[in-house]
């Protein structure tokens, strides 16, 4: 064993594990939700300021008034986070902006603070609370704005090229070649023009001018031949005709059109990242690399020759002349061109250097033009950019330059919360700007104040719309802490401005070599979203441009040692370096032990000489995400099963008694701490007071080298709160009074946590064996002990609410006095008519008694007399009480009442709101879904009495039997190693940590098993619990960590006798949520036809489905005990006839004797309403599209 292997390592304050890691950790894992918090912080500090700076000043059409936004501040939120959840309001702070109005005529300046709406704040755990619900803003992966070049092959096999200039917002510019070697340009997806037309329009009018700039070549000659415009004016008119067909073109309007499309900073925005990528792509040094220069470069100041003509520019030569190239005062290759009569009047500076075309005998000269390093502040495209991108395109035709891989992470970037919010806020501000301009021109300029000009409605609306209905604003997955953490680290390629599922091809979804250390190759949903929704890798960070960076250890080239200096590299920076694997053997001094090192360079994984290496991986787990890093022996699992394992851990239901895994990976502590489910200390201190609902910590500050006691910090704990998914969210104190805590220590466990570690399931004794065929097809056989001892018992909380509103006929009333309800049904209601806390309820029980006024009918004389005698009481009301829905029930955990009179904020028209929480304790039962961490999932098929389970030689019965046939074909061998190591861990009484790709190997597992006194093969004799006889063969038995998943049979079981019907077809609705029936489909009808079961078939097609009259009469007949009447005509048949008649056909239904059948309507049937007869309200059509979910 390695000296590190088998050492005890402390994870948090309360757990030690024996770690099998061989590689020392050089870098701490970062805070895992930093991607959310840092981005939002940037938005509050910089993003908002940038927005106001962009929009200031707003001037009216005459230029007399100008409105400037000077500064802004955020106030304090009205309610704290818990109150917001309770009251169903948004956690937000008021945004106030300091505005200055300047009147140029009178030189008058007015300043004012303007309230610009409440701005949603991010909680400490990286979520937002919108209308009382916790939501997460998912980061979006989009194409970075830049210039992209690609090659294409036409149908005749001829190779050509295309290029696109993609801005952050604004018009696209595309170049392409055709079969005749002419280069075309498309402006904003319109018809194509020869590219020279665009160059002429920029003010380079004559053929000779263009040839001088771009350099003479056949492609350019072909293009010039195709181009009919001889001058700048003609070119401008031609472009105008293409962009605005049918309008009379003039030179001026063409100039202003082109200006507004490309050169106006308000309309065209490359953003910081676009300018950076553009300058990088068009930079002259990358394009000169390894080319032969065709002119002698001279230092203009000293006259010294830098590079002789005909020199090949390798890395060294380039590095030598780079300072001269980048210094515009030296002027090497810099040219200033004047745009005569073009769109812009200013001169254009470019940098142009001649080289020889590679692989060309005739030594053809090519001009390489760069945009002369445009300043980062210029966010719009410039004529120099256009010239140099056109030049790059012509260079590509001569194999100079490189095409881009659009799936490379150097060309895809993240838009996190801050930027998404900023874009939304920008939309709101620009709508507001329009209003301000209009009001400036209407109102009296002398008396006007800023407040009157500004309408904040559009700003508030755009923010609300973003949080409420954007595809990227999602209801947080709160099933367990891991689900919460993963949701905050999710990267989606979908959403506004991104891809759509249907359009996304195979390449976008595939794993790319640049994902290494940035995006997890394993964790992604199965199904239509595969590869479009990803997870951030564990060590990855996002830089200021939105590119994902991953850390590497730098290798010192002088000494050949791997240093502990960490560099974060983006995907395109990494392309320039050779990177060694994290598990490369090192000498004690940090140099490579072997001459040959396994490493990566771009897409190649091969063996390199150690002298070539530039960097080394930080950790083996930097490849995978937070959830995947929780799978022990990941290296022994097939990737498809590992994907299922990572996804199913997120569906684990928090158990009543959580237990951390015996065999973990060491990530459990980090995931639990950063998820936001635990209570984490903010400061140094000593615990002074611990109780179930709060923990008090006395802060300790260091003053003059001495420790001094400071303020008391109080941490509130959540007890049995309903999570977003209906699981119980409960925190339990972990620390004791007098304990010393440091910042980021865990004070209290959240749900699915034990001793500060993630604990999604339980360690159970598993045998891999069949038992009477009950574990066929991955089914699970379980011992009754797990039910009796509440091993897999979970707590679920449902919330039901009822509101009393004002109706047209009068207000609804919450009361105990409900018509036609016996005293027995009211026994658990208090005097207000609201259920008491602690009552046990079943489905159909009343939770809140409520009556609604019915329409007032004309009273008869007798009724009026009764009214006169007994007063108002006989008023018509109907029972609209809130009842427990089908299949629900449990114990009332809590009741909350909100009254308008008490000053609670309620929606308009609502007087009172009552919320009841029902808690259920669900033991595990047949039909529940279980899984291990290796994608080994199954459904419980049988729960056996403890005495029938097979038992070990010492008499211990096993807990679970799994089918051994589930392992070989699935190739998730990790579960077998976990089984053996888990058993050893139980015997030794030590928890194990086997980190991914750096954990225990077979040898380690065997040695640990021997130390625990087990057989080397991990098998044991088992005895049949029924007969006491031993089984024929020895069986693998061990401890496996098994999880109970959120797919519970209680949520899926459903039955209906009568219920709601669809409005048009009158057929029963479908699905548990609608209390629907089971569809008896086309094939099932064929089956009955084949059997000749005529009466059954007739019933199914009529009275059990949509014969409206028949089903009412049948119901009556069954109730009265009479024989079932003749069925009538199904409603869907009537609908069909009506549809045919609506097409203008005359359709009648005739009997055998050619008499027309009367299709009677229900109304004619003695005014019998089916709903009244069955006591069921008719349901509206619920055949809408299902709501789009993100899995």
Swiss-Prot record:
Molecular functions (GO terms): DNA binding; DNA-directed RNA polymerase activity; ribonucleoside binding
Instruction: Kindly give the InterPro entries that the UniProt entry links to this protein.
Output: DNA-dir_RNA_pol_bsu_external_1, DNA-dir_RNA_pol_su2, DNA-dir_RNAP_su2_dom, DNA-dir_RNAP_su2_hyb_sf, RNA_pol_bsu_bac, RNA_pol_bsu_CS, RNA_pol_bsu_protrusion, RNA_pol_Rpb2_2
Sorted UniProt keywords: DNA-directed RNA polymerase, Nucleotidyltransferase, Transcription, Transferase
Q: What is its EC number?
A: 2.7.7.6
Question: Looking at its record, which EC class is this enzyme?
Answer: transferase
GO cellular component terms, A-Z:
DNA-directed RNA polymerase complex
Segments of skewed composition (Acidic residues): 1181-1191
Q: Where is this region: Disordered?
A: 1164-1191
Pfam families from the UniProt entry: RNA_pol_Rpb2_1, RNA_pol_Rpb2_2, RNA_pol_Rpb2_3, RNA_pol_Rpb2_45, RNA_pol_Rpb2_6, RNA_pol_Rpb2_7
Keyword Transferase tagged: yes
**GO terms under biological process:** DNA-templated transcription
UniProt xrefs under SUPFAM superfamilies: beta and beta-prime subunits of DNA dependent RNA-polymerase
Q: Please give the subunit comment from the record.
A: The RNAP catalytic core consists of 2 alpha, 1 beta, 1 beta' and 1 omega subunit. When a sigma factor is associated with the core the holoenzyme is formed, which can initiate transcription.
Recorded family membership: Belongs to the RNA polymerase beta chain family.
Q: What does this protein do?
A: DNA-dependent RNA polymerase catalyzes the transcription of DNA into RNA using the four ribonucleoside triphosphates as substrates.
Q: What is this protein called?
A: DNA-directed RNA polymerase subunit beta
